[in-house]
Amino acid sequence: MSLYGMIQRAGASGFGYNSTTDNVTEGLDLHGKTYLVTGINSGLGLETIRILSERGATIVGSARSEAKAREAMAGLPGPTFPLACELSEPPSVRAAVATVLAAGHRLDAIIANAGVMALPERTVHHGLEMQFLTNHIGHSLLVTGLLPALTPTGRVVMLSSAAHWQTYREGVRLDDLDAAKRYTSWGAYGQSKLCNLLFARELAKRLPAGQTANAVHPGVIATNLVRHVLPDALTGLWRSAGTALALKTIPQGAATQVYVATHPAAASITGEYWADCNVHKSSKHGRNDELAAALWAKTEELQTKL
C-alpha cells in the first residue's frame, strides 16, 4: 500500500482508493455475462479481463492484432473471443464491430480501456491529432457501432482520467483537432480524456432506460502508457518510488472500471464521472452539456469522412 493510500478511506459505495478488482467483485457470479474490453494485452485491460473471467464471464477482448488478443487471453479460465481492433484506423474499428455483430454476442458491458498517453511530438493521422483520434474517435466509433449488441441493461464504461482537468483552456478545440495551431502533450491527452468523459455524458442521455454510460478515472498507475513520458532510465524509478508514495497498483487501478461495469449498486447510475469506485465531481468542462452536444455533433461529422 502506498503512503497516500494509507490515509484514504472507503466512500459511500463501501469501496475506495485501496479497493482492488478482487474486492469489488467478491461474491459476484458473472456466468452467462459477456464483456467487451479494449486494450487487453497489458496493464488495466489485462487485469480487467482476468478478474471478469475468473468470476465466470465470457470475454470479447480486443488488441491491435488478433494474435495479441489471443495471447492476452490464453490463460483465462472462461470463454474468450479475440478481436483485432486498431483504434486509430476507422476501417479496423468498423471491421471489429461487424465481427462482433456477426458473431451474435450480447454485451453486458463495453469497457473502453485502450488508449495512448501524452505523445511527446504532435502526430497527425487521418487529419486528426493522434490522441484525439485513438482515444476518442476510435472508441466512439466502436461503442456506437456496438450499441445494437448491448443488452437492455448493458453498460458502457469509458476510461477517462483526472488528466481531463489538464485540457486546453477551451476544453475541446473543435476548430483545431489536428493541433496545427498549438500542441502540448498533456493538453492533447487531457483533451482526449475530456472527450471520453463528455462522450459518456452525452451517450447517457441517448440510451434507452435501463442502459447506462459512465466515465472513470483509474488513478495514477505505473503502466506501459508512461513509455512516451519518461526515458527508459527513469521508468523503473517511477514505478518503484511512485508506488511507495502514491501510485495505485494495477488491481487497484482497474477496480473502478470493473465496479462500474459489474456491481449491482452501479446498475442504475448513468452519465457520471467516477474515481475510487465512487461518483466524483469532474471539471467544469466535464459538466458542460453544450460542449458535450457539440462534441457529439462534430464526432458524427468526422466519422462520415473517415
Model-identified regions with their sequence ranges:
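C-terminal helical subdomain
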Residues: 9-15, 192, 215, 240-280, ...
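Pocket-edge positions in alpha/beta enzyme catalytic cores
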Residues: 61, 85, 245, 284-287
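A short C-terminal helix-loop "cap" of Rossmann-like NAD(P)-dependent dehydrogenase/epimerase domains
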Residues: 177-180, 232-243
